[in-house]
């Protein structure tokens, strides 16, 4: 939540730090701020850490969630690894990590999973691994992210309240029908892939809420498609 990271963002800028690191209340998830004060998307961190693991163990499996940037898939493919898409949620991730003997897994929400940590999530290992990566390359976090930010344009998660759970399901079915000319799959909510963009819309597990994540190859396409889907959800 943006208001919860205002203090660390201000401190990073004030001290001219190369990186800011924050944890949630029980420290099982980890979040990052770059040296410019910009929040770093969890799927970009997943991509960076996947690369680090695959350099050490080429051809390994990496688990990522349905909302993630193509950056993850592209980097895993670059190192001849296997990128395994999965449902959102730590219970589903831990099960899949163990079943596949995956070396690493990452969720957009800042949960990261490690084969060497019993296939479970850990909030401190991502920070240590990212600091190691920065040290080895003698660069800042913003430097590591620059190639990703130039190529992948993501919306971040956008939440929309819906009147009822029945309407949530109707909207999901409507999206699947409206975007049927793409590659549609329903691993978790509705996802659709096109040559220059893709999206996932999924329901909250606890309230009548739809969550949109979208990515495109340009900022303009991302904004256009984002607004179109939000218009449908909110109509």
Where are the model-predicted features located?
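Short, hinge-like loop/turn segments at secondary-structure boundaries
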Residues: 1-6, 39, 79-81, 102-104
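Phosphate-binding and adjacent anionic-ligand microenvironments
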Residues: 19, 55-213, 218-235
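Short Gly/Thr/Asp-enriched flexible loops that form oxyanion-binding sites at enzyme active sites
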Residues: 28-47, 72-73
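A conserved helix-loop-strand patch within extracytoplasmic ligand-binding domains
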Residues: 48-56
